[in-house]
Amino acid sequence: MTKIKIVVIVGPTAVGKTALGISLAKAFNGEIISGDSQQVYRQLDIGTAKATQEEQEAAVHHLIDIREVTESYSAYDFVQDAQKAISDIVSRGKLPIIVGGTGLYLQSLLEGYHLGGQVDQEAVKAYRNELEQLDDHDLYERLQVNNITIEQVNRRRAIRALELAQFADELENAETAYEPLIIGLNDDRQVIYDRINQRVDRMLENGLLEEAKWLYEHYPTVQASRGIGYKELFPYFVGEMTLAEASDQLKQNTRRFAKRQLTWFRNRMAVSFTAITAPDYPQVVHDRVRDFLGQKEKS
């Protein structure tokens, strides 16, 4: 079976994945698929660092604004939606470029997180039943024992992540439809942390507070409201924190999230990282994609 070539851009939040994705889409006739668990939600634009209207006009984006904030979204949903988007993009002779930081979603797509194929479905069912009998404390203890970090922890995500870890050997042998080139972006920790702090400041200047307040007033308990970028501001709305304290909390949580993202990508995906401050960074990445696609450099 001829596998479909796709480019996947990963890295911590605020590292510049969107800009690189657009650059590659322009250079290699590509379209972008968002691999971010929060960008699927309509009306949540600033806190999710969604591609701006200008950026979406520069390159076609998929899997953005496809759910209402009242709806849930899972790794399974992402796999189904991403597979459809990839097929659509390829059918028009274009290159699928997945840009995102939700490691569980990306691994689900690339490694068969549906737990089908060669995996013993009865064994999966039995293991799932075992996990469902555990209380929250014991379930999250299992995560720690297996060195699993997941974003926006809840029982469903925890159980699915443990299933993936339990049946990893079978999944590694399963046939996948894609041949990915995984491009990792990173840099010195302080560079990333400075970029995160600056991004949070820009978000607040651009209206994040109003966006978070709307979410808090209308849908404070939905899945979307638990994402980093919103819940940190809720204490400010009820007078439990000053805006400066809430902003600092948001920066701190985002930095911690970036660290967890890097840990996930290093431990779970075959990725080599490129420093975004390297003088030849853009050219190196473009050359890698060109080689991957078997194209010659234009003179």
UniProtKB/Swiss-Prot annotation:
It catalyses: adenosine(37) in tRNA + dimethylallyl diphosphate = N(6)-dimethylallyladenosine(37) in tRNA + diphosphate. InterPro entries: Dimethylallyltransferase, IPT, P-loop_NTPase. The keyword Oxidoreductase does not apply. GO terms for biological process: tRNA modification. Its cofactor is Mg(2+). Catalyzes the transfer of a dimethylallyl group onto the adenine at position 37 in tRNAs that read codons beginning with uridine, leading to the formation of N6-(dimethylallyl)adenosine (i(6)A). Belongs to the IPP transferase family. This is tRNA dimethylallyltransferase. The lineage of its organism: Bacteria, Bacillati, Bacillota, Bacilli, Lactobacillales. The gene is miaA.
